[in-house]
Amino acid sequence: MKRLAIISLMSDGGCHIAFLELHEELLHLLGQVELIHSYMLVDRREIPEHIDIALIEGGVRTTHDIELLKEARSKSKILVALGSCACFGGIPGLSNLYDLRASLDYVYRGTPTTTEGVIPHENVPSVIRVAPISRFVQVDLQIPGCPPEPEEIKEAIVSLIKGEVPSQPSKTVCDECELGPPKEKPRRLRKIYEPPEPDRCLLEQGYFCMGPVTRAGCGAKCPRIGVPCDGCSGPAPKALDQGISILDALVTLAYKNIENFSLKQHSAYFYRYTFASSVIEDLLRKKLRERR
């Protein structure tokens, strides 16, 4: 029987919950694997040896995360990035838009503050720029999403148990959406609180929808109920960079509405989940290395 472990780094636990949301199917799955590590289900603190499949949730934020990640990699035959934080850095990666020291000063020395104004440094891990786990170890499979789809988690584990390569979506959310893709250019950009017209592409109506550049697999759940896709599953297979891809699309569709582009202002849209793994982040890291 294959040995399965779920290991958490910087995480809110949402991906772990997505695994548990298999409900009764989880019982069938646990009949095929031995769950040897899970902070929600197994009373065991240390990472065990001889892991066949390790699911890693959360991105890297501290030096402790790096050590834990490398330990998991050394003890695992197959390592899977579970969720968009592990795959791309996730929403915490937007903090990389700001200077790390300034961010720490704001949290610990800002006004008002509930701390003594001292940044912890003794006997605690160092805080670093947010990064996907692939920046430090080899990743064998990615299951993105915030959170990932429980069914996709199950299907991936079942395939790995059988020694098969799990199938991965090759299309975009737009391909899964009954409303899109857009057939005409939007006349203006709409706010998310404005009620959409039913049965019409949201991007076409002027809502900021990431569907054209986002990996399929969710069934376009958000656009189907009138909520624009926010790109939580990361870039579509053929998109080199999610933010650059959607910016390119918007230049074609609505150039006049985005001519006052601001990296810090718009990155929460273009790179909500993928800034830490973006081309821009690579350039920022290179610039920081040159300064040293």
What label would you give each PLM region?
Residues C85-G90:
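Short gly/pro/ser/thr-enriched loop/turn and capping motifs at secondary-structure boundaries
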Residues M1-L55, H64-I66, K70-I78, R101-R292:
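Iron-sulfur (Fe-S) cluster-binding modules
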Residues G58-V60, S84:
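Short glycine-/small-residue-rich Rossmann-like dinucleotide-binding loops
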Residues G93:
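Short aromatic-enriched loop/helix-cap "lid" or pocket-rim segments at secondary-structure transitions
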Residues N96-L100:
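Short, hinge-like loop/turn segments at secondary-structure boundaries
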